[in-house]
Amino acid sequence: MSGDAHVRFRERLGVRFPRATRLVVGFEREDDARRFLDAMRARLEEFELTLHPAKTRLIEFGRHAAAQRKQRGLGKPETFAFMGFTFICGKSRQGRFQLQRKTRSDRMRTKLREIKEELRRRMHWPIPAQGRWLRQVVTGHFAYFAVPTNGRALNAFRFYLTDLWRRTLRRRSQRNCLTWDRITQITDDWLPKARILHPWPKLRFAVKHPR
């Protein structure tokens, strides 16, 4: 972005912005980013709105961030969280820059705690009933988080959920009857395998906006 920063709201249309509105904006030049941020703050103040001080920041991120920071004797580029993902400046297997996304660890922990509590309430349900419910949970999780570069987090989610299910079943029956081999067989019968479901962003963009 160059020139003056223009931050406009559609106030004439009566659009309301919730307090939790989130926005990520990318710039090639730091001075453009700072000018935009100042303009954004000023514009929001006109409507008695503010940016969250702990969640608003400028970071060096992108294709050249790692090399530029290395030249200055700094560490790896910072990451940022957005819409349930942590965004990372990574590298592909060919050593090229790759924007990577992985499930936020705190979001995964929260989700697993919720599943643990619900499994306790459903402890005495038949295994098929538990399996059908857990299949819906895993399918919904994968439908959102199964993006490229997030395969490891998907496998981790399925593994920890399997362990929670194993612990729940062991609490209601003889412990020695439910080995890892047995619970693995049960989960393979009921839970989908972790796999990437969404295309790379550039492929999705090409479909929506063909040249």
List PLM regions with ranges:
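Non-catalytic terminal/accessory segments
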Residues: 1-211
